[in-house]
């Protein structure tokens, strides 16, 4: 779904663990790393697209995650001219994205990069919260910065809650 301004509707997914680290994935056969993302199909809600992409890209189902929050508005980035396919109609000049912050409820082994048979990623790791902002390709950096800033208080609350649990156990 490309809007009248040339932006493709898309969902972005940040998966965090109970320590506030985020899942960082390497694109299949490339050296670039990013968060899972993907376009909306016709007639699909944003949440339906998020769950579909979540399964297609990292093999997780709704029962494996908890939605913590989502962005208040759509965020946009433009593609570099070299990546715009002028021959396709309508021409897509970039992405407009609704982002979700999810917490993995299960174990790391529930992540399966080959769940769809056409993997988007060939490796993944947990990284510190702000790491992706410095590492993502430059044309996505501003969107990543905005998303991470919007979600920061939620992940900080996760980290604080986990730290408090550890201290309580140590005192017992």
Curated annotation (Swiss-Prot):
Q: What class of enzyme is it?
A: hydrolase
What's this protein's function? Accelerates the degradation of transcripts by removing pyrophosphate from the 5'-end of triphosphorylated RNA, leading to a more labile monophosphorylated state that can stimulate subsequent ribonuclease cleavage.
- The protein's Enzyme Commission number: 3.6.1.-
Q: Which GO terms describe its molecular function?
A: mRNA 5'-diphosphatase activity
Cofactor requirement: a divalent metal cation
Protein name per its UniProtKB record:
RNA pyrophosphohydrolase
What single Pfam family name could you report for this chain, choosing any that match?
A: NUDIX
Could you give one GO CC term from the UniProt record? cytoplasm
Name the species this protein comes from: Shewanella frigidimarina (strain NCIMB 400)
Q: Which NCBIfam families does the protein's record reference?
A: PRK00714.1-1 (NF001934), PRK00714.1-3 (NF001936), PRK00714.1-4 (NF001937), PRK00714.1-5 (NF001938)
């Amino acid at each position: 779904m490309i809007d009248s301004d040339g932006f493709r509707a898309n969902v972005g997914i940040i998966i965090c663990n109970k320590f506030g680290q985020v899942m960082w994935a390497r694109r299949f056969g490339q050296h670039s790393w990013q968060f899972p993302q993907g376009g909306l199909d016709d007639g699909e809600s944003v949440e339906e697209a998020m769950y579909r992409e979540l399964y297609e890209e990292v093999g997780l189902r709704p029962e494996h995650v908890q939605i913590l929050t989502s962005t208040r508005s759509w965020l946009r980035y433009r593609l570099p001219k070299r990546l715009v396919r002028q021959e396709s109609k309508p021409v897509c000049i970039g992405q407009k994205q609704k982002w979700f912050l999810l917490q993995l409820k299960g174990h790391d082994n529930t992540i399966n990069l080959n769940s769809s048979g056409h993997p988007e990623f060939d490796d993944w790791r947990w990284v510190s919260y702000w790491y992706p902002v410095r590492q993502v390709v430059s044309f996505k950096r501003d969107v990543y910065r905005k998303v991470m800033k919007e979600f920061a208080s939620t992940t900080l609350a996760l980290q604080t809650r986990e730290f408090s649990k550890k201290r309580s156990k140590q005192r017992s």
